[in-house]
Design a protein with these regions (language model features):
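Conserved PLP-binding catalytic core of the aspartate aminotransferase-like
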Residues: 89, 99-133, 149
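PLP-dependent enzyme catalytic core of the Aspartate aminotransferase-like
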Residues: 129-133, 138, 142-170
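Short beta-strand-to-loop capping motifs
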Residues: 46, 116-120, 153-155
């Protein structure tokens, strides 16, 4: 099972592998690129025999009518989807470069967020400064990794505010 929750923001995906191998399944969600996190609506791409096996055990009412209507409307508006996706990609690139200018090491992202660590100081005080100013990012400190920040791509205004606050702290 390949989880492609962020595939719409990536340069490549694994959908074609489904045709090559009957045991490969790809799951997608409308939570990220379609902005429907609250609906918890997704889908599975697999060969027909795999789908048939899932249908044998699925609940008769596994999706409610509101979620189906929301998902149908979202999928039907590909212009909005493409505009939103392109905006996220542009803003992600701007965030990436802005963080690098402030001394961060930024891992190239294939999602709607970036992961960064600062080359000369810990991330925790930066995280606290952002939180104190009502800018919420995720602080992570995993064994074997430098502590770092996971920053979601927001609007241009949100990214400007985030970068300005970070600049005050570094």
């Amino acid at each position: 099972l390949v989880d492609e929750a962020y595939a719409d923001f990536a340069e490549f995906n694994c959908i074609d592998l489904v045709e090559e191998n009957p045991k490969i399944m790809v799951s997608r969600t409308l939570s990220k690129s379609y902005g429907l996190a609250g609906l918890r609506f997704g889908f599975l791409v697999a060969q027909p025999q795999m789908i048939a096996e899932f249908c044998k055990v699925k609940d008769s009412y596994n999706c409610d009518a509101i979620s189906i209507a929301g998902a149908t409307a979202a999928i039907g508006d590909q212009q909005w989807f493409n505009n939103n996706r392109n905006k996220v990609l542009e803003t992600r690139q701007r965030l990436h470069h802005g963080l690098e200018k402030l001394g961060f090491d930024v891992i190239p992202s294939q999602a709607n967020f970036v992961w960064c660590t600062h080359s000369s100081q810990p991330s925790k005080p930066i995280y606290e400064h952002l939180k104190d100013n009502r800018v919420l990012v995720r602080y992570m400190d995993y064994e074997g990794w430098s502590d770092g920040l996971r920053i979601s791509v927001g609007t241009d205004e949100q990214i400007d505010a985030c970068l300005s606050l970070i600049e005050m702290k570094v």
